[in-house]
UniProtKB/Swiss-Prot annotation:
HAMAP family: DNA_gyrase_inhibitor_YacG (MF_00649). Zn(2+) binds at residues 9, 12, 27, 31. InterPro entries: DNA_gyrase_inhibitor_YacG (IPR005584), Znf_NHR/GATA (IPR013088). Belongs to the DNA gyrase inhibitor YacG family. SUPFAM superfamilies: Glucocorticoid receptor-like (DNA-binding domain). GO terms for biological process: regulation of DNA-templated transcription. Inhibits all the catalytic activities of DNA gyrase by preventing its interaction with DNA. Acts by binding directly to the C-terminal domain of GyrB, which probably disrupts DNA binding by the gyrase. This is DNA gyrase inhibitor YacG. Pfam families: YacG. Interacts with GyrB. It comes from Geotalea daltonii (strain DSM 22248 / JCM 15807 / FRC-32). The gene is yacG.
Length: 59
């Protein structure tokens, strides 16, 4: 018998079927979109040095 690992939705922590799941690693389209919204609203950030924006003058 093949042993399968348990996977959990990063947003709601429900157990997720990995195989044949079009939303993986999420459990649903809803959780996937909530996560995407968090990236867009900058709730999630990747650590590193801040680059100057194009609006800032280099003079």
């Amino acid at each position: 018998m093949k042993k399968t690992a348990k996977h959990f939705c990063p947003h709601c922590q429900k157990e997720v079927s990995w195989q044949d799941n079009p939303h993986r690693p999420f459990c649903s389209e809803r959780c996937k979109m909530i996560d995407l919204g968090s990236w867009f609203s900058e709730n999630y950030k990747i650590p590193g040095e801040k680059k100057p924006s194009e609006d800032e003058d280099d003079n």
